[in-house]
A protein has these predicted regions:
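Cysteine protease catalytic domains with a Cys-His-Asp triad
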Residues: 1-174, 180-185
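Compositionally biased, intrinsically disordered low-complexity regions enriched in proline and serine
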Residues: 15, 21, 36, 117, ...
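A diffuse structural propensity rather than consistent per-protein peaks
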Residues: 21, 105, 196-199, 285
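Generic alpha-helical secondary structure signal
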Residues: 24, 112, 120, 137, ...
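Residues that form generic nucleotide/phosphate-binding pockets
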Residues: 112-116, 202-209, 295
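Cysteine protease-like catalytic core of ubiquitin/ubiquitin-like
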Residues: 151-274
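Contiguous terminal or domain-adjacent regions
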Residues: 266-307
Length: 307
């Protein structure tokens, strides 16, 4: 069995030799049989049983000449035609970059976080976005309705920003995490720098909402001074004194390739319940963070097709 077969999506469990569930395997076996009946696959049909080990063995035997792992199964026509998005995109970890030290792309980051939205029902990820996100209405960040998020059970928010604008090639990834229930807003830059002004403006909007929820009556929040600077190096404004707004001042990254992995790692550790202070105070160096790629991703290889 390939190691890639054990890299289940975060809300799936590897059991009885597979990340596929019994329901998945039955669906796949039924589709296989239909392709046999239509003459598109030359093989014996699979006996359908409510037995995961049986179905796994039967599919393995029929696919062993073209697939040396179960990830390859998802590339076969009889499975792709099911058009089951959860099966195709949320059984295994997403594809990672080709090189061990290759930068993470927007797609890599979004693919990872999309799977964690399925694991954590109270989590909403707003995407890996350029620094001019407020000028791009389709991203939906400038006009976030925090009341609606709270009402829908989405209390944990994640953002990954590239410090280049949308028309540029990309420079450095950073991350922001907020827990609306706990009134926490945490920023992480693997270089330990103060957040860029446009990120601070977003922090201001989230902070105002959290502060108003806890400290303002419905008709009094308009009196709140919104001109204060946020995330200053050595002092906090009135709102920051009441809620938990922090950014890291210490540098973790010293090499050139891991800012995207640092950003993923920060948000995922927050979702897992690790304290912000523990994350920022205990440096995780580049080589250690690079190892997380083997957890967050599977790695591409060419596939054959069954005939």
């Amino acid at each position: 069995m390939s190691d890639e077969d054990k890299k289940c999506a975060p809300n799936k469990k590897f059991s009885e030799g597979s990340c596929f569930t019994l329901k998945d395997l039955k669906k796949m076996a039924i589709s296989f049989n239909i392709f046999v009946e239509k003459g598109e696959i030359k093989s014996n049909k699979i006996e359908i049983k409510n037995d995961k080990k049986h179905l796994l063995l039967e599919l393995t035997k029929r696919l062993e000449n073209i697939c040396d792992n179960q990830v390859c199964w998802l590339k076969q026509k009889f499975i792709k035609q099911l058009k089951d998005k959860d099966l195709l995109e949320n059984t295994f970890r997403p594809n990672g970059p080709d090189g061990k030290f290759e930068w993470l792309s927007t797609i890599h980051i979004n693919d990872v976080m999309s799977q964690y939205e399925k694991k954590y029902n109270d989590f909403k990820f707003f995407g890996a976005v350029p620094i001019d996100f407020d000028a791009l209405p389709f991203l939906g960040i400038k006009d976030i309705n925090y009341n609606e998020l709270q009402d829908s059970g989405k209390s944990k928010l994640g953002f990954v920003f590239n410090l280049d604008e949308h028309w540029q090639s990309g420079s450095h990834w950073v991350a922001l995490y907020s827990d609306l229930e706990k009134n926490q807003i945490y920023y992480f830059d693997s270089y330990g720098k103060r957040p860029e002004k446009r990120i601070r403006n977003l922090v201001k909007r989230i902070s105002k909402w959290c502060y108003g929820k806890e400290h303002c009556q419905s008709n009094r929040c308009s009196e709140l001074n919104t001109s204060d600077s946020y995330m200053r190096p050595k002092s906090k404004n009135r709102i920051e004194d009441k809620i938990n707004v922090e950014y890291n001042h210490n540098r973790h990254q010293y090499k050139g390739s891991e800012c995207g992995v640092y950003s993923l790692n920060f948000i995922l550790r927050q979702l897992n319940g690790e304290s912000y202070q523990n994350i920022v105070d205990n440096k995780t160096l580049d080589d250690k963070v690079n190892e997380c790629r083997d957890v967050y991703f599977k790695f591409k290889k060419p596939f054959n097709q069954l005939k």
